[in-house]
Amino acid sequence: MNNSSKLCRKTSFPRSNIFCNLVDKIVKRPSLQFLGQWGYHCYEPRIYRTLAKILRYVDLDGFDILLTDYIAFVEKSGHRFELNFNLEFTEICVNTILYWVFARKGNPDFVELLLKKTKDYVQDRSCSLALIWRTFTPVYCPSPLSGITPLLYVAQTRQSNILKILLQYGILEREKNPINIVLTILLYPSRVRIMVDHELIDIQEDAKTCLMLCSRVLSTISVREIETQLSLGRRPIIQNWLDYIPPTRYKDPCELVHLCRITIRTQLLANNMLPNGIFSLLIPTRLQNFLNLES
């Protein structure tokens, strides 16, 4: 028996683990019996096909199981695989999962479940289980090295319903340069959108909603940076874009109530309590909804 297969069985799982089984299938192939022969071209197609078959038809319960298996697989990496294989295997798995969740399904429920399941890891960007910070390729290709993060992809496609969920979980507040997300929403060239009920969503209306959502998170939005980009010849998706950025984000004093929202959310974010921690606060429901970016 192959050493890697033996080591995989050393880790005890309460039931059959999707990813452990997938490794077993890979290492049983005669062409992969020697570690030196392992490489993307050898096993990537099998990983993608296996996970794609699951993700294409999976419901929320099934997706919950898949994420649980992946977390258990990574956390209990007593498998002791060759380092390069371990990194490449998990990289392909993450690329495939994010591709199907964000680029193929575009379902807010799946996005929220992914955030809930990996919430404990999001504060450490280097953690392999902080999936929301990993990159993927929107047009699928084996390597995500030239990919983008889910937040940037959602900004490019102006999926306002998914952006709202990401913002509620504090993903924009964790960005080093959040203005880049605003610039992407406003200036990224439009392209074919995900179809919902076989109807194409009005991209301009979604862009307006995305700008409004960002204004609920940020205290300032640099109009100067936007105008600089426009002076270089870039064209905004919304012609009257300034109408959708509150004056209190770029010229007038910021509202006190919004500053309070930012302060409370920042404290909750520091303790990894967004958004659930909002609803444990002993305040009226209307204020809870305000903190949760509903208005």
Curated annotation (Swiss-Prot):
PROSITE patterns: SOCS. It holds the Pfam family SOCS_box. Specifically expressed in testis. Localizes to spermatogenic cells in testis, with highest expression in round spermatids and condensing spermatids and lower expression in pachytene spermatocytes. Keywords: ANK repeat, Ubl conjugation pathway. This is Ankyrin repeat and SOCS box protein 17. Belongs to the ankyrin SOCS box (ASB) family. Residues 243-295 form the SOCS box domain. Disulfide bonds: none annotated. May be a substrate-recognition component of a SCF-like ECS (Elongin-Cullin-SOCS-box protein) E3 ubiquitin-protein ligase complex which mediates the ubiquitination and subsequent proteasomal degradation of target proteins. The SOCS box domain mediates the interaction with the Elongin BC complex, an adapter module in different E3 ubiquitin-protein ligase complexes. One of its GO terms (cellular component) is apical ectoplasmic specialization. Pathway: Protein modification; protein ubiquitination. The gene is Asb17. ANK repeats lie at residues 146-176. It comes from Mus musculus. GO terms for biological process: cell-cell junction disassembly; intracellular signal transduction; protein polyubiquitination; spermatid cytoplasm removal during spermiation of flagellated sperm. Gene3D superfamilies: Ankyrin repeat-containing domain (1.25.40.20). It comes from the Eukaryota. InterPro entries: Ankyrin_rpt-contain_sf, ASB17, SOCS_box, SOCS_box-like_dom_sf.
